[in-house]
Amino acid sequence: MNIMEISKFQSLGDKIRTMLEDHGYLSENNDYEPNPIDGNISISYAYPIKAFEKFLGYYDVENRVAYNPSISMRTDFSYCIAACRYNKNGNEDTVILDGVTDEKYLRKAKFALDYFRKEFRIKGSFDFYIRRYRRYTKAKGLSESSAVAAAVSRALIKNVFGEGPALDDVFVSKYARLVSGSGTRAAHSGISIWLSYPGINLRECAAFRVADDPHDVYYGIFPKYTDIATDSAHSVAVKSIFYASWLEDKYANIKRLIEHNFDIDELLISGENDMLKLNAILFSGGLIIQTGESLRILRAIQDFKKNGDLFFTADTGPSIMVLSRDKSLIEELRQSVEDPYIEGTYNFNRHTRDLNNFTKEANEYFLENKIE
């Protein structure tokens, strides 16, 4: 992308920021004083998100700044619980994910923690014990990484700053961003927007809640798996000859959504349209993220759509989400699609049934791996 295009998107981003502020969606940036305590253990949780206006491609990889803002809703297809321990004299961070050392998340965590330590002048290391709880076995495109990023970030904030700052979702979202861009939005309940664009003040590169959970919208997902990495999609997208025009459309859509106070019916339409455009962008770069199974489901949905207002969307994976104000439409569709299906709800207390066992498990792990 050339300098003139980047300058244009910075200008468009500044206008979006001003609009959000004028409409009362931006909250004040709070500063907190770190108070890390050696051996302190903190625990937090998060649920994943599903995007209406999506993002692909980082303008600033080092600081995890996307080329465009993105909008999503919280879902309950899974959840993540994370425990964090501070080691004042430690030299090496550790990450245990689902019972094993995970090199991918260790690299992401180290990047974020180095950034965090430098910003707040903190020495020492952090140990994370993380577990994901899924309502499915194996799938791609259900935003697990967003829940992991948000849970880890909130546990870290609680450990270093205390309970109060850990309740500041905007503050938490800034550091979730460093693990996963979508993690910014998973730091919030309801519907949220991640304000991100070229040249943004990094203090404001965070997510902001813009609406409650849309309880009058029914939703669910057909989980499907592919081994395509999200990072591959990011790198392919920015090379597409259609990428800049896609971004222009997104800025125009987001401007309209702000003007209409993030009307849920418009968000449903945006989610479907943007999913199709995202797949076209990746296809133009030679990356096909849908599978034969997901294409069959999409065809069935398209054939069924003439029966009423049923919408679909997907992110960087073949798992297809359906949404409607009319639950009977989804139930009728499912009669013609026999694939495994997860019904979404607005029950965001599922984690409580596992919290005690997780806490015991994490404490036992930390006890076995004592701070020297």
UniProtKB/Swiss-Prot annotation:
Keywords: Isoprene biosynthesis, Lipid biosynthesis, Lipid metabolism, Lyase. It comes from the Archaea. It holds the Pfam family MVD-like_N. Homodimer. GO terms for molecular function: carboxy-lyase activity. It catalyses: (R)-3,5-bisphosphomevalonate + H(+) = isopentenyl phosphate + phosphate + CO2. Pathway: Isoprenoid biosynthesis; isopentenyl diphosphate biosynthesis via mevalonate pathway. Signal peptide: none annotated. The keyword rRNA processing does not apply. The keyword ATP-binding does not apply. It is proposed that Thermoplasmatales adapted the classical archaeal mevalonate pathway by replacing mevalonate 5-phosphate decarboxylase (MMD) with two specialized enzymes (mevalonate-3-phosphate 5-kinase and mevalonate 3,5-bisphosphate decarboxylase) in order to produce isoprenoids in extremely acidic environments. It was found that at low pH, the dual function enzyme MMD is unable to carry out the first phosphorylation step, yet retains its ability to perform decarboxylation. The lineage of its organism: Archaea, Methanobacteriati, Thermoplasmatota, Thermoplasmata, Thermoplasmatales. Belongs to the mevalonate 3,5-bisphosphate decarboxylase family. NCBIfam families: mev_decarb (NF040847). Transmembrane segments: none annotated. This is Mevalonate 3,5-bisphosphate decarboxylase. Its EC number is 4.1.1.110. Catalyzes the ATP-independent decarboxylation of (R)-mevalonate 3,5-bisphosphate to isopentenyl phosphate. Functions in an alternative mevalonate pathway, only present in extreme acidophiles of the Thermoplasmatales order, which passes through mevalonate 3-phosphate rather than mevalonate 5-phosphate. One of its GO terms (biological process) is isopentenyl diphosphate biosynthetic process, mevalonate pathway.
